Amino acid sequence: EFGPLAHPEQVQMRVAKRAMMLEAGIAPYPVHLDVTDTIEAVRAKYDGKLEAGEETEAMVGLAGRVLFLRNAGGLCFVQLSAGDGTKIQGMISKKEIGADSLKQFKQLVDLGDHLYLKGRVIASKTGELSVFATEWAIASKALQPLPALHKDLNEDTRTRKPYIGMIADENIRNMARNRSKAVASLRRTFDDHDFLEVETPMLQTLHGGAAARPFTTHMNAFDLDLYLRIAPELFLKRCLVGGIDRVFEINRDFRNEGVDATHAPEFTMVEAYQAYGTYDSIGQLVKELVQKTAMDVYGSHKVTLLDGTEYDFGGEWKTISMYDSL
């Protein structure tokens, strides 16, 4: 389980630390910090280019989520993670920031906090790329403890609190990024073929375009019963009637039916229509959409799912007529 009721003592300790910060005049959620660099950019520039123990004069200011803390007396080590999972080590030394600041660091910083570090880029004695801090600040004080990063979350937590899954599982974060890449790729391909993107009504007086049970609502202004759309088809076809010869929409649809791992009550649908086309032309378009999306997201026509299943979308696709399929 995860949440305040599951870890009351940890939450209370974090709330107390936030109170300490406020009493000391330290903002637990500062409006601005001098973040001049990203963890990804520092990694890209220096990773593998410094010898163990080598120091540079390059100053950086970066922030990330605290995933690891180690207290070694006059020196503390912290691991910061960027949103994409890129990590970097921070080193906070009494010699560099002073005894009072180091004491405050040990008192206030917890796993899950977002931490700002400003300092020099170095390689530790073990060769780990690090930021040797001259300044530090809590960018956002976390009141909830992190989930156990080495354990799988239960399905209920993953479903009801997807943000927890994103923290715990890099694959889930990557899925969100890949979805964004896929949608952008679809739009580029449609645009290359002169399709116009439109947004059609979500609230409709008639639920058509598919056979599904709709969600219902009521518009008070017109005293009118309405449906959340189950498909955009009817309004897209009206665009064709109006003279838009190639039209598409990427948007949400709603169906008040069964829910399982592959069916959600609200979901994104891609739908397109083309005047003067044939089933051959739309088939070629679908193939191109899938192949280009695979390349843009994975860099290959071969796609491996999380369960290990592999699909190869490359080359020519086999075709079969509707008559032969029956």
Please provide the spans of the model-predicted regions.
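Class II aminoacyl-tRNA synthetase catalytic cores and aaRS-like
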Residues: 1-326
